[in-house]
Design a protein with these regions (language model features):
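Specific register positions within alpha-helical solenoid repeats of the TPR/Sel1-like families, i.e.
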Residues: 154, 193-194
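Catalytic-site signature of metal-activated, phosphate-bearing donor transferases
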Residues: 16-19, 38-164
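Active-site nucleotide-sugar/metal-binding loop of Leloir-type enzymes
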Residues: 13-28
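The conserved acidic donor/metal-binding loop of glycosyltransferases
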Residues: 26-38
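Short loop->beta transition adjacent to catalytic acidic/histidine clusters or analogous donor-positioning motifs
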Residues: 1-2, 26-27, 158
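TPR/TPR-like alpha-solenoid signature
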Residues: 147, 186, 190-193
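Flexible helix-coil transition and linker loops at the boundaries of alpha-helical arrays
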Residues: 136-139, 170-185, 194
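Short, acidic/glycine-rich phosphate-metal binding loop used to engage nucleotide
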Residues: 3-11
Length: 194
């Protein structure tokens, strides 16, 4: 076990430092958080889907659960990747990016791989707002982070800032994902009625 302190804290820096600690002979990196659990059989399902030339796996992720224990928000995630050719980017809500010089990546869909997130509702998420502000400062045209910052301002009841950021999100030419655009519009409506 290696213990390190990442200061100032950024999720991408911490994940990239962790990647540096992965043994050189590793082929595949599986990134999970301490509050996430794979369903039994995930490794066999991953190995069946991963073929020569694969560099990243797409698999099912349950982000939260309803009060009755049924699945809440579910989507596909891509945090399993080849040992080389990837780096994490963004201070928060970090994502994998293919590095230059490694050629195009090739994804596989890993049917049967299921990761469940069991968030601790008592855990503070207070660090997210300043990290999202930093993310948008670093990359002002990243539609995903602009949306997340508008949403975070909404959570903090900072209505005017939320409205400005969500409108900015909707105006970005890269903001084409219908689900996220819809979320921005719903939050805008709530901002106006707050």
């Amino acid at each position: 076990v290696v213990e390190e302190r990442v200061e100032p804290w950024r999720f991408d820096t911490a994940r990239n430092r962790s990647l540096e600690l992965v043994p050189e002979d590793a082929d595949i990196c599986v990134c999970t958080d301490l509050d996430e659990v794979f369903h039994p059989g995930w490794r066999a399902a991953l190995e069946a889907a991963w073929t020569d030339g694969t560099t990243q796996a797409v698999y099912r992720y349950t982000w939260n659960f309803n009060a009755d224990g049924s699945e809440g928000t579910v989507f596909w995630i891509e945090k399993i990747h080849a040992r080389r050719g990837y780096r994490w980017t963004h201070p928060v809500h970090e994502v994998l990016e293919r590095q230059e010089g490694w050629g195009p990546g090739r994804k596989c869909t890993a049917e049967g791989v299921q990761l469940d997130h069991h968030a601790d509702p008592a855990k503070s998420r207070g660090q997210y707002l300043p990290l999202l502000e930093l993310a948008v400062e670093e990359d002002p045209n990243n539609d995903r982070n602009v949306h997340y910052l508008g949403r975070e301002y909404f959570f903090y009841r900072r209505w005017e800032e939320s409205i400005a950021m969500l409108k900015r999100h909707l105006a970005l030419p890269t903001a084409t994902w219908a689900d996220e655009r819809c979320a921005s519009m719903r939050l805008l409506a709530k901002d106006y009625f707050a």
